[in-house]
Amino acid sequence: MEKFEEISEKHKSRQQYFVYPLLFQEFLYTFAHDYGLNDSEPVEILSCNKKKFSSLLVKRLIIRMYQQNFWINSVNHPNQDRLLDYKNYFYSDFFSQILSEGFAIVVEIPFSLREFFCPKEKEIPKFQNLRSIHSIFSFLEDKFLHLHSLSHIEIPYPIHLEILVQLLQYHIQDVPSLHLLRFFLNYYSNWNSFITSIKSFFLLKKKNKRLFRFLYNSYVSEYEFFLLFLRKQSSCLPLASSGGFLERIHFSRKMEHFGIMDPGFFRKTLWFFMDPLMHYVRYQGKAILASKGTLFLKKKWKWYLVNFCQYSFSFWTQPRRIHLNQLANSCFDFLGYLSSVPKSTLLVRNQMLENSFLIDTQMTKFDTIVPATLLIGSLSKAQFCTGSGHPISKPIWTELSDWDILDRFGRICKNLFHYHSGSSKKRTLYRLKYILRLSCARTLARKHKSTVRTFMQRLGSVFLEEFFTEEEQVFSLMFTKTTLFYFRGSHSERIWYLDIIRINGLVNPRN
């Protein structure tokens, strides 16, 4: 326990930086606004309504922040919908938005400086390819073939607001910044309760994604730090218990000598002391804990995680958030793919002299497919098709030029194919491609008050080339003379791209 506290203090004790005065600098809000534009979601997912940046309003905000009653009035009226009880809703909403964006930049500075001043001998080599989301599947394919059980974990959220502030106190000792953080959390929800309301939780997430991501990542990093430490300690249990294990073998031999030995006693004890070979993978709010251990050991880890969240973060984790399954008989939804490790039987004919016989060989393969229902539901929510997958026009885009409409539909199609190129069955992708292509044709026909057939005949091959994906272009260049190879062989060919650093917006529309 003393070692645990020592490592915990080293993890929490960092050089502190006082960054609160930066909130009174105009360049900070300009930088936050420009950074938000560069880090925005793809244009086809966002709405057309964008808030404009005004340097004049930023100067007015800084002047008001110098006033003594600026924060006092805000704290005394926490239940009001408008920031600072401003009469004009536009000004109130703009001030709260731009101030929260600037604050999100400020609280990230100590963490950025910590990496900047990291000693060179302790620097970890950075591999750009490992940033890709698809690199995770290469890891899963390499490790999961030898494992037995799987725990699908939904990381508990939301968490009590005061715990979020306490977690940041270990890294940021800038007291005014922490008070300002309490002010923002108090503004978005009721301070005296848990954020158990889905409406309050998603309000903070919608209003300021950058601040929400920072708070959530701080919470998850603290959660994983303690979890990883205890996991490393538990991996040493087989070595630490070797002495007792040998004594137990010696004692069991004595019992066997007297004729009262249980045949299954030794085997069960051996499995209990084996290293479980656990692997942990997380992205956003979902995590996977795979192991080679028994189901009994996985149940112990399940209740350990429940108690860990309860006593370390004062948060009650429902056991139903952790699902235990056998890896060979189940599939799990992760990063927009339905992954599984099925067992298949392969018949091998063996010839030995004059005799021949068949041998049944079981093989395991890491399989990834595209969830058709989920993607069609996302396209339906984005108004590209109906709930049953019937393509419809998108009226909101009829005001754009023909080239912009073709470009938007083409980029959506290419992004879907690019992200889901690791699917072993691509028929679902071809169905989505058909939906987007026909939806584009209906949108153009609606704009020009024509029929779909007439517009398709007018555009011809130009219309089809806009939906020609990168994967198809590669295969068409490699096999120009044998075009049938692509249509026959590439349905099961999986391609993992190492340049994808963001999950597709249509895959997870709730995040």
From Swiss-Prot:
Point out the signal peptide segment. none
Q: Which InterPro entries match?
A: Domain_X, Maturase_MatK, Maturase_MatK_N
Indicate where this protein resides in the cell.
Plastid, Chloroplast
Q: Which UniProt keywords apply?
A: Chloroplast, mRNA processing, Plastid, RNA-binding, tRNA processing
Which domain of life, per UniProt?
Eukaryota
The keyword tRNA processing is assigned to this record:
yes
GO CC: one term?
chloroplast
The biological process GO terms on file are:
mRNA processing; RNA splicing; tRNA processing
Q: Which GO terms describe its molecular function?
A: RNA binding
Q: What is its main location?
A: plastid
- Note whether Plastid occurs among the keywords: yes
Which family would the database say this protein is a member of? Belongs to the intron maturase 2 family. MatK subfamily.
Tell me the function of this protein.
Usually encoded in the trnK tRNA gene intron. Probably assists in splicing its own and other chloroplast group II introns.
Per its record, how is this protein called by name?
Maturase K
What species is this protein from? Brachypodium sylvaticum
What gene makes this protein?
A: matK
